[in-house]
């Protein structure tokens, strides 16, 4: 995109490159407010690395314990492969440690594949079973369950380099946010995700909003937003 401005003489003149960059950075610093599963989400400016954190109260935590089918049923928003598969969502959209494939251990799902949530002192232990002996274990953490852990309260979880996680409970929902920053040559950007999980009709309802922003030196700026909601039925219903 090429921006132009007019001088008093009426001649068109290209806007200086530095001004284009400043305009792009101003856009990049923007923030907004959205609603995800009836919960207000205030997105902070992301250029300065601020994490997305919602209010949290342990008394408002839902019980996510249960075993759920891997394949979800769309309920609202856009279809998204990264959300409609529960194990893929946890492993790659949220980048939870312990759940992605490794060189020694690959996910080979069968129709019996499932994901189990078990209550744990620090949140919910997640066990993904591909139905033929392959098991991956991770943790959906409670933000308030950081006592005794060598990190600041409300701090990000140990995860992949460049990935931040925060989690907690509000309005009967468990929320988790993930932020991944990237840089390549003269370009930089960020992926941000917030997800709210709650039990519904014996299954698990997952509501997600994802944002991506990138900026380069042309200068150019791009952004994208996807909202999805999927319901994952109880594993027993598939038998």
Language-model regions: role of each:
Residues 1-31:
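Sec-dependent bacterial lipoprotein signal peptides
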Residues 31-121, 177-179, 200-239:
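Amphipathic/hydrophobic helical signal segments and adjacent flexible N-terminal regions
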Residues 65, 165-171, 196-204:
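A short, structured loop/turn motif at beta-sheet edges
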Residues 105-184:
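Predominantly extracellular/secreted and cell-surface proteins with exposed
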Residues 188-195:
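Phosphate/adenylate-binding glycine loop and adjacent helical scaffold
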